[in-house]
Amino acid sequence: MDIKKILAEVKRGCAELIDEERIENLIKNYYEKGENFFIKAGFDPTAPDLHLGHSVVLTKMAFLQKHGAIVQFLIGDFTGQIGDPSGKSATRKKLDKEQVLINAKTYKTQVFKVLDKEKTQIKFNSTWLNELGAAGIVELTSTFSVARMLERDDFTKRFKEQSPISICEFLYPLLQGYDSVALKSDIEMGGTDQKFNLLMGRQLQRVYNIGKEQAVIMMPLLEGLDGVNKMSKSLNNYIGVTEKANDMYAKILSISDELMFRYYELLSQKSLEEIAQIKKDIEQGNLHPKKAKENLALEITERFHSKEEANNAKSEFDRIHSQNALPSDMAEFEIQGKIWLAKALVECGLESSTSAARRSISANAVSVNSQKVSDEQMYLEQGEYILQIGKRKFAKLKVKE
């Protein structure tokens, strides 16, 4: 087995590796001695759905599962009630325990769309953090100083601006680091925004003398559909892993050619050599960028659905956009009495709020019965309407008298 080649794939797309030699030795020991190793990634269930941004880390872990890794998929049901302060300019609202548990349940069903179930352990950090107790918390907090905490850019900025920083937020990185002590992880993965917390795990493993120090693999934050901001549900630039095949396929096709290669690098399971060949073929005019994007959309859609559903999504997309046809699975709604268009867009699930709907109207992105609409105050009287936003969102609305 070519360990160097495997390590090159591990490093692919990574923002930073800490203790690369340890990662190499873990893989080598698996092939030479049959010893598995443990790779941890924590996810606070603060929202009900995972998106492709989350799957960047999952995809890398899935690759490592083929080379000896047992994934410790850690659901932060305890820390999720605090909220990770990383990159935040204000104290996060404390989440309700019931909502955290509901979100955690959906994570358990979604994660196996990427990871090998037989090589994955689902863990909840309440298991050990609930047992830590006051004495354990005091011992944990004694391992780190306030001065070190204030080295974090986000805390420093808030401190200088005299914005509140709760003691809970100081506790968060300590608790995340303690997770690595409890799990005895060999590697921890996370985004670049998690560096402080990930290094905390290494330090606490040393302090608690568990006989190992985890290596760290940091992945870049995946840009959303806009190609500028990180993928986020709040920015509405995301692709959810549970989205319908048609929507997933269409959204991937909407990204720019430049962003396409970023997605290939971080989300595709094609080898580095295969991706290099795709780039070369495009540069030499042997492959159209649109075809390369279609192939990427098919690959990702198939991973989260099935080959048949991915192919059907492609056929449906081609039918709609080449023939100016309407989606065959367009949702239908009925409303009693005339309705403000912005509200109708929300009622039909095409927008999340009337404010967002008005922005779409002012951006000339909304059509009613194939006619562009620019009047934000437009009302729909009795009749039947085809509502459309952009190229992907459609709904049929019947307004009754």
UniProtKB/Swiss-Prot annotation:
Enzyme Commission number(s): 6.1.1.1
PROSITE patterns xrefs: AA_TRNA_LIGASE_I, S4
Any one GO biological process: tyrosyl-tRNA aminoacylation
InterPro entries with a match to the protein in the record: aa-tRNA-synth_I_CS, aa-tRNA-synth_Ic, Rossmann-like_a/b/a_fold, S4_RNA-bd, S4_RNA-bd_sf, SYY-like_C, Tyr-tRNA-ligase, Tyr-tRNA-ligase_bac-type
Pfam families: SYY_C-terminal, tRNA-synt_1b
Residues the record lists as binding ATP: 233
A molecular function GO annotation: RNA binding
SMART domains: S4
Domain of life: Bacteria
Motif ('HIGH' region): 45-54
Subunit-level organization: Homodimer.
General function of this protein: Catalyzes the attachment of tyrosine to tRNA(Tyr) in a two-step reaction: tyrosine is first activated by ATP to form Tyr-AMP and then transferred to the acceptor end of tRNA(Tyr).
PANTHER family: TYROSINE--TRNA LIGASE, TYROSYL-TRNA SYNTHETASE
Name the UniProt record assigns to this protein: Tyrosine--tRNA ligase
Taxon lineage: Bacteria, Pseudomonadati, Campylobacterota, Epsilonproteobacteria, Campylobacterales
